[in-house]
């Protein structure tokens, strides 16, 4: 049944998704589950060929980065794959979970050895890179019902898969990040929601220190220092990575505003108010749920993770704290794509199933914001209260939609680590980084 009031959700999502003209990352943890559609190990998947058959059974190899311990992976293995196999006799899905960064690198390696899977769930920022490598199938050119299938998905979400007039994937989900904060700790300290960067800094300073058990407490957590993590702070404070045409980093990545934003994070780390990205640090969900981290920027999946691991933990949310440029989060999301070595008939059947209203409603229960129009208008989405994230999408920005983004992101992460963790000079490091990024943009 559909609620008439949920039309508002679809309207908001459609409006918000107009921001999705570029790209969108999501994540959790890892440990395989055993199900009727049993997840194979990476070693086994190496031996599985893209168009493998066993008698009359065709195997569809699907690589993804739903963490193996996550609700998303449980739904994939226990609900979606069994349903697909039931509806499509003769097909078996061999699903393999990878860490987010490992999946990207695995695809690069497999492309050179011609051992790519049939289908993969891709961070939208990877699509231009893989298209440039000529390993993705142009779906609108090769699938006769592409127009019908894609019409069921938000047009602006589909734009993340469009390159030079052709479509190389189907939109699968969208997301962004908002601020989660420890409501009880904030109330006890007389603090209100951290709606500005000044609020965030003041709260981090006041709440960091040692708790009643003698344990260290930090005001702000980020699990990494990649673009996905640091860009909201840079953008909200008026900084940039490149010019608006994505051709130049000098004078943007090393501008005064970007330098000041990065220095803010470095100072917080130096003052023991910011952590989470070093080896051995408390994992994000555990640190937040046990009161060791007071604030973090995260996506809609964090709601279900906290409900499962720390159901009694009291937290609240607000938009990314606004700086001089406003509140600007980072767009996230994934597309589902077919590789040119695939068993195309089976791969396309699976892709259509994964973007169906049924599959997207099931994934919405796990914190994935659908891009299927029917799923967006469902009771599942209405009851999940995605409104704060859909609101944030309207002002969020995409990571630069360039084929060299993965290399740029690696260089950015290295520079942020050098500055924040190791105390390198901010201006000098960003000057050098801007020069490197200029060269990568020119490739």
Predicted regions and their residues:
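C-terminal motif of bacterial Sec signal peptides marking the signal peptidase cleavage site
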Residues: 21-25
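Extracytoplasmic/periplasmic substrate-recognition and gating elements
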Residues: 82, 86-87, 92, 188-189, ...
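Hinge/lid segment of periplasmic solute-binding proteins
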Residues: 99, 124-177, 201, 229-233, ...
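Short, solvent-exposed loop/beta-turn-alpha elements that line the ligand-binding surface or hinge
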Residues: 140-153, 210-213, 218-220, 239-260, ...
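Glycine-centered hinge/linker elements that transmit conformational signals in sensory
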Residues: 204-206, 247-277
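Long, aromatic- and glycine/proline-rich binding clefts that accommodate carbohydrate-like moieties
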Residues: 156, 311, 315-318, 364-414, ...
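Extracytoplasmic/periplasmic solute-binding protein
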Residues: 163-172, 177, 199-250, 293
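Conserved N-terminal structural module of periplasmic/extracytoplasmic solute-binding proteins
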Residues: 8-12, 27-135, 144-147, 193, ...
């Amino acid at each position: 049944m559909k609620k008439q009031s949920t039309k508002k959700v679809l309207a908001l999502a459609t409006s918000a998704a107009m921001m999705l003209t570029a790209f969108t990352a999501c994540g959790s943890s890892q440990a395989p589950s055993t199900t009727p559609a049993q997840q194979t190990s990476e070693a086994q998947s190496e031996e599985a060929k893209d168009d493998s058959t066993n008698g009359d059974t065709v195997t569809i190899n699907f690589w993804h980065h739903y963490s193996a311990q996550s609700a998303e992976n449980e739904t994939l293995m226990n609900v979606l794959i069994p349903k697909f196999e039931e509806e499509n006799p003769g097909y078996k899905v061999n699903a393999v979970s990878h860490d987010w960064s490992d999946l990207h690198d695995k695809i690069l390696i497999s492309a050179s050895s011609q051992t790519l899977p049939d289908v993969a769930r891709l961070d939208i920022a990877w699509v231009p890179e893989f298209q440039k490598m000529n390993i993705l199938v142009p779906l609108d050119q090769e699938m006769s019902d592409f127009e019908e299938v894609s019409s069921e998905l938000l047009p602006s979400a589909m734009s993340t898969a469009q390159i030079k007039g052709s479509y190389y994937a189907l939109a699968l989900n969208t997301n962004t990040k908002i601020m989660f904060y420890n409501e009880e700790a904030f109330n006890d300290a007389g603090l209100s929601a951290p709606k500005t960067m000044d609020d965030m800094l003041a709260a981090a300073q006041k709440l960091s220190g040692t708790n009643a058990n003698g344990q260290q407490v930090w005001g702000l957590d980020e699990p990494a220092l990649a673009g996905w993590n640091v860009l909201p702070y840079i953008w909200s404070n008026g900084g940039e990575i490149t010019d608006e045409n994505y051709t130049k980093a000098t004078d943007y990545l090393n501008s005064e505003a970007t330098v000041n934003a990065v220095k803010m994070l470095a100072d917080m780390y130096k003052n023991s108010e910011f952590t989470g990205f070093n080896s051995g640090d408390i994992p994000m969900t555990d640190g937040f749920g046990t009161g060791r981290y007071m604030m973090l920027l995260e996506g809609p999946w964090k709601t279900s993770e906290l409900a499962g691991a720390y159901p009694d933990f009291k937290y609240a949310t607000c938009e990314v704290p606004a700086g001089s440029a406003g509140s600007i989060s980072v767009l996230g999301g994934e597309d589902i794509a077919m590789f040119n070595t695939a068993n195309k008939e089976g791969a396309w059947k699976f892709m259509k199933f994964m973007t169906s209203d049924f599959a997207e409603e099931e994934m919405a229960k796990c914190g994935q914001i659908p891009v299927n129009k029917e799923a967006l208008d469902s009771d599942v989405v209405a009851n999940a209260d995605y409104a704060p994230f859909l609101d944030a999408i309207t002002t969020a920005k995409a990571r630069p939609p360039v084929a060299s983004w993965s290399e740029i992101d690696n260089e950015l992460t290295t520079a942020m680590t050098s500055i924040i963790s190791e105390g390198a000079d901010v201006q000098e490091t960003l000057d050098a980084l801007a020069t490197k990024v200029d060269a990568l943009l020119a490739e």
